[in-house]
Amino acid sequence: MKTLIKNAVLLDMVGDKPNAHKTDILLEDNKISKIEEKIEEDDCDIIDAKEMVVMPGFINTHTHLAMSIFRGYKDDQKLMDWLENAIFPVEDQLRPDDIYWNSFLSCIELIKTGTTTFNDMYFRMDKTIEAVEQSGLRGVIAWSI
């Protein structure tokens, strides 16, 4: 299957500063096969990306995917008070499936915001790895210390 993205503004990071230029991008089997100013290709789906920007995926170097469910929870406290009195007691109640679904939710959020690679640390990493594999993202994953 081929997809041709036409008329995109490509933001590349070649050199000392970002460079933007109009380009076409050909995808074959969901992988970039050609990037040129003008591509003519038959028998493919065409996406008109006029006034849209194509750029490298973002990289998030510090995540705790399974903690997405705690976002905003009792966040008016100092860090150690928040961890010891709010987060740790709730984390003790998390089941393996909770870790999986919280991590999967975070993967969806990363994808929707253009993040393609991340670094994650937590516990029950087997469940986080399972969610990441399902999502197709790239991750560097380690146990929290």
Each PLM stretch: what is its role?
Residues 100-145:
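Divalent metal-dependent hydrolysis catalytic cores, especially in the metallo-beta-lactamase
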Residues 14, 19, 67-71, 121, ...:
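Active-site-proximal flexible loops/turns
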Residues 36-44, 130-134:
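Short loop/helix-cap segments at secondary-structure boundaries that form the rim of catalytic
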Residues 1-41, 52-53:
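N-terminal metal-binding scaffold of metallo-dependent hydrolase/deaminase domains
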Residues 19, 73-76, 133-134:
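Short, glycine/charged-enriched secondary-structure capping and boundary segments
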Residues 69-100, 108, 140-145:
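Active-site gating loops and adjacent loop-to-helix segments of metal-dependent hydrolytic enzymes
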